[in-house]
């Protein structure tokens, strides 16, 4: 295999010198004149670079003949089809147009004007302003149950188990009193009186912003419940979502618990590394995780020239060591919004441990995206992989069925607690047999009128993703 570090000039030479992709053209060649000045512009170079990316990495580019082999076909053509995927200013509208010709709803482009916000949404958990702690009523006392790492409460020295007695000299008698008392703006000062080991203390805390945690631990009728909101690189923990999960799992193991409920309801996914590592924490050394069939590229000799061709690599992840939670009995909660990376975790654990699932059929997204920066500083997300379980099966477009189909959220939790308490039930359901409808043609696009370029929209468009190292 050749070194995969191509300059934009190399890509241009390969693209203009000969037909580098062996697919049939899906529209006629461009008839408009493209001047030398056009070709030297950053806008044309960005189009050319993204054409290479789609040709190399987009899973269906050649399998379904979706991408025209001539990048000039797309230059300065403002397509009207589905501009809800990604975001472009007028200068890069043809790049968005090219991406929007691909049928896959998760293959999208954001031009340089949006790139900072896009990367922040993909890599960081939401920011909050406050002290950064969770509380609960334990034995009629209001107690800190979690102090978020790198939060104002963390730096003020507060610890789990501290008993709250007053906030700003106001006696706290309920959780509602506490929540009201700690409200404020960034840089406001809050004084919290608390008891630790029978001694009274006061913490002076300046409210500030911090990355919210994505993993939460609570107990229901004596059963530990880990709720994972999303899988993200930068959170309250320096190691992201996986770091949070590992810490909470260690607490459960240290506590001697035998069963665990993992709540993945409304978890739309995130960075694949985190759901794979979290899965490995629950498995034994050598057990199979996900298998990825991934589109990539290679250069081959064609006469006196090099030719770039798309190919598909298959890789499988394994648990490299015994996970700290390998002996735990696990029950999952899932629903129709459980998607992508959270479905990978469900797939990994249920295929290895036959862990039961309570809730509703999941979303059914068994494909993955590669994200990275482009030549001009934009951001691309390209569907480049299909995902399979240890047996070579996929839930894509059909979802993962629950063992207990229950619609009411409270009843879902009650059933999960019942199963976890007994700790004997094995999974008997499988993947869905009927399409969830989420990948039907009519469901492929979101209304551009309704689109708001916010964090939720960006992460819905990403799902399960990895950050790629590509040509530069």
Predicted region positions:
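Cleft-lining beta-strand/loop regions that shape enzyme active-site pockets
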Residues: 182-375
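Second-shell loop/turn segments in exported
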Residues: 32-39, 78-86, 149-152, 166-167, ...
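Conserved PDZ fold ligand-binding element
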Residues: 153-176, 261-263, 392
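Bacterial Sec-dependent N-terminal signal peptides
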Residues: 17-44
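Mobile, glycine-rich extracellular loop/lid and propeptide segments
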Residues: 134, 145-159
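BRCT (BRCA1 C-terminal) domain core and associated BRCT-interaction motifs
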Residues: 357-397, 402, 410
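Bacterial N-terminal signal peptides that target proteins for export
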Residues: 2-10
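Extended, small/polar residue-biased N-terminal targeting/export presequences
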Residues: 55-139, 178, 189-190, 197-212, ...
